[in-house]
Amino acid sequence: MRPTGRSAQQVRPLTFTRHYTKHAEGSVLVEFGDTKVLCNATVEEGVPRFLKGQGQGWVTAEYGMLPRATHSRNAREAAKGKQGGRTLEIQRLIARSLRAAIDLKVLGEYTITLDCDVLQADGGTRTASITGACVALADALNQMVANGKLKKNPMKGMVAAVSVGIVKGEALCDLEYVEDSAAETDMNVVMTEDGRMVEVQGTAEGEPFSHEELLTLLALARGGIDTIVQAQKAALAD
């Protein structure tokens, strides 16, 4: 029995609160159970130096956790004077994932930054960030079309992510913290809405996992992501 009584295939209760803050071009509070992440999209004219003159845009991301997002307080990275390796890895993952959702040539010379701030962490913060940021990105792009900044929407489709893992020998979808901390195998999967893989991050914490277990976990992730994409689209249709 899982802590919240879910089935092995079931994702946590999922909500998207759009237009959560008023200044950002896209702003979404995403909640996967007790994990809550604020995702804001900012649109700016211009692109990084390495893209100037190429007629395409850029999507980047920043990620951070509030000091009391977890059980005990973690000092702000700004107070330490540098970002940690985990933070850098996660924000690069978020950016890579979101770039898979849009046609950068159609975007033109604009940069969109997704700021993902974890308000409360209970497992799956990076996958929640990707999932919520994609909705914020969609809102920002829709606004750019409505304002006449873009003639065509560069969004190719939704991108979503979920964690899967093996806990006490059982393959589970969308791990919460107590499951994640006890997992023998832990994997984060990012997919497009049509089931193509953007990124797969998998680690055996204990015993190595088999090829068959890998396929089981990927199938579990696909099912979870299908559910998540439906929720993304329903939120955007409101």
UniProtKB/Swiss-Prot annotation:
Phosphate binds at R86, G124, T125, R126. One of its GO terms (molecular function) is 3'-5'-RNA exonuclease activity. Transmembrane segments: none annotated. It catalyses: tRNA(n+1) + phosphate = tRNA(n) + a ribonucleoside 5'-diphosphate. The keyword tRNA processing applies. InterPro entries: ExoRNase_PH_dom1, ExoRNase_PH_dom2, ExoRNase_PH_dom2_sf, PNPase/RNase_PH_dom_sf, Ribosomal_Su5_D2-typ_SF, RNase_PH, RNase_PH_bac-type, RNase_PH_CS. The keyword Transport does not apply. SUPFAM superfamilies: Ribonuclease PH domain 2-like, Ribosomal protein S5 domain 2-like. One of its GO terms (biological process) is rRNA catabolic process. Homohexameric ring arranged as a trimer of dimers. Belongs to the RNase PH family. This is Ribonuclease PH.
